[in-house]
Amino acid sequence: MAYKHQIIERKWQHYWRANHTFETSDSQTKPKYYVMDMFPYPSGQGLHVGHPEGYTATDIMARLKRMQGFNVLHPMGWDAFGLPAEQYALKTGHNPKDFTAHNIKNFKRQIRSLGFSYDWSREINTTDESYYKWTQWIFEQLYKKGLAYEDKIMVNWAPDFMGGTVVANEEVIDGKTERGGYPVYRVPMRQWVLKITAYADRLIDDLDDLDWPDSIKEMQRNWIGRSEGASVFFPVDGQADTKIEVYTTRPDTLFGATYMVLAPEHAAVAKITTPEQADAVKAYQEAIESKSDLERTDLNKDKTGVFTGAYGINPLSGKKLPIWIGDYVLSSYGTGAIMAVPAHDERDHEFATKFNLPITQVIEGDADTDITEAAYTDDGKHINSDFMNGMDKQTAISAAIDWLTEHDAGHKQVNFRLRDWIFSRQRYWGEPIPVIHWENGETTLVPEDELPLKLPAAKQLEPSGTGESPLANLDDWVNVVDENGRKGKRETNTMPQWAGSSWYFLRYVDPTNDQAIADPEKLKYWMPVDLYIGGAEHAVLHLLYARFWHKFLYDLGVVPTKEPFQKLVNQGMILGTNHEKMSKSKGNVINPDEIVEKHGADTLRLYEMFMGPLEASKPWSTEGINGSRRWLDRVWRLLIDDNNRLRDRVTMINDGALDKIYNQTVKTVTEDLEAMRFNVAISQLMVFVNEAYKVDSLPMIYMEGFVKLISPIVPHIAEELWSLLGHDETIAYAKWPTYDAKQLVEDVVELVVQVNGKVRAHLKVAKDATKDAIEAAALADETVQVHTDGKTVRKVIVVPGKLVNIVAN
């Protein structure tokens, strides 16, 4: 008789809620284990089957650690601000707050139906005023330390889209908005910026101490992009007071620099452009106004540029270098100016070839190297480089930097690809930035004791049309007057969705504290997060921003650790049956509600963990889900009869038949669960069930141990079996089983039998067999006798536990 999953799962979910089974104590008498998921954005679509994969993995670890005696913190919350809710509100006229609350209710129902052991008493929501009070507080501390500042930033401005709004680089295609095809222009706009670059070195160096996938660490290192090189100053010919600074990682190639390229927005362009070239330069600048940074730096696009009419002076060679502007150089990267070495850089070579600029080789190539045809980008000895001739790369770099420093023409420089974090959004549905701009030009923070600065209700969410957020339309909220009659305006930009997720792991520790982010003693106990699981799509930005804020709070003395997440695991993607990514447009999205209703939550949990390694992407299989359900029925029938009672085979007597396989299973499953090899652990549990079906009696102690072993993976059926085994208390805190190492010792060993040095047979003998017994058994082996027939055995060499070598002729 199959187990009735609907009844059993509802029963135990109700039990857990009614008994507050998974509410975490802040008592510090036990070792702690803090395990969490990347909290979801509560979309209108609800959960898909990809969500439970990571959630099941963290739940298995949480349940395992509870049974091993740890005090486990396993929370859940909602990353609920963001553009989708605002777009939905604009489209439908619904309030994003109501829409978000409805979505959260649905998400929570779905998550609860899967039996995850979250401590819901610690639930957080980034849109709650009591939560974003502290998001605003962190911003204010950043501002006080000079790490939050205003700046004019080039943005993608679409004046005809949604009444006039800023769009992201990814939303611009061929100079038009992805949605609607409206023209986009690059314009400078006032933005709030966070100085993440102040932490760039620490963000790279501290990765070494983290138990993270190497691929994720490397992505972060590349994003931060630390490089060592030199800043070089190029005087402008005929303009004694003007020098152009260039950052290069290859100062050793300065003798090969034949021209310079500035970003069209570079501050020096207007000053150095000659009257003859002014019209061409202006036309070029206007032509590239609508291009996003992504389009401008696309390696596949044709290089474009215009000569300014000016020349820079190469500080090493004294030669004049024509100064061009080109859109592939960005003002936001480095100094916004490059020295071009076309003989040894493919992009520079392409530009030089197109505009017939000189190419000078300074690195010795192969015999067939022709720098007129292509750049030579490998290493080699330096040539045509004066005092650097004959030097290798590193020696020449050091020599070039020494020369530049000695002649005040440059200096050693560490540079970063990382740019400061543009922190403001021209949107309504986000945390208000707690700043007031006064009529006398002063900017002040909202006093801390007046936080949170609440997001006001708004009926109209259309953009202001000025580039400001819809909050600019709310005069009563925007306009303020201080006690002296001074007039001011509130900041109308809001924070990005990244803000709330940059510190939420701290709030779980003490979610109702209204005096601080969290109690310092609780933070000291719980931090860092021991295990953090989520998708690799957050490998860079979320994790980088969270690490930045955490390090800042560490410097303030608010948190006790330098890093927030000690171990990180990225679960793989669950694909459609045809190995394609699940999406609504492809019609291959699978709703977990349907699986839970038909097969049960335990079946879904078991299947997703058995599909393959956690980190791997794998296709959904209907047969696989059916197979997982069949195995659970098999587990049920092993212990429970058709009358829903414990089988008579379950006995207090142990005849020893399962000793070895049980102890092997406890050892293997424990090790595999701790290493998060969930599919391997499940395979061993299946082996145990197969063996258990072969024996006459099932010792109670082994059946209890087995039910404990399956409980982190399939908790509902485990709770029911635990109850039927005679226990009144939940299995959630039952002591994790241990194994008897003596039972794992093999009683029989296999020996290799050689005749005249060649392997002829394999022999199984008792582990404690004597040499005489082993010799007799080897000589009696039929295969050995074939190879000794008609020969005289001269000698038998026995190496206990390994081999027998028979010498015969």
From Swiss-Prot:
It is an enzyme of class 6 (ligase). Keywords: Aminoacyl-tRNA synthetase, ATP-binding, Cytoplasm, Ligase, Nucleotide-binding, Protein biosynthesis. PROSITE patterns: AA_TRNA_LIGASE_I (PS00178). HAMAP family: Leu_tRNA_synth_B. The lineage of its organism: Bacteria, Bacillati, Bacillota, Bacilli, Lactobacillales. This is Leucine--tRNA ligase. It comes from Levilactobacillus brevis (strain ATCC 367 / BCRC 12310 / CIP 105137 / JCM 1170 / LMG 11437 / NCIMB 947 / NCTC 947). A motif ('KMSKS' region) lies at residues 581-585. CDD domains: Anticodon_Ia_Leu_BEm, LeuRS_core. Gene3D superfamilies: 3.10.20.590, HUPs, Isoleucyl-tRNA Synthetase, Domain 1, Valyl/Leucyl/Isoleucyl-tRNA synthetase, editing domain. A motif ('HIGH' region) lies at residues 40-51. ATP binds at residue 584. NCBIfam families: leuS_bact. GO terms for cellular component: cytosol.
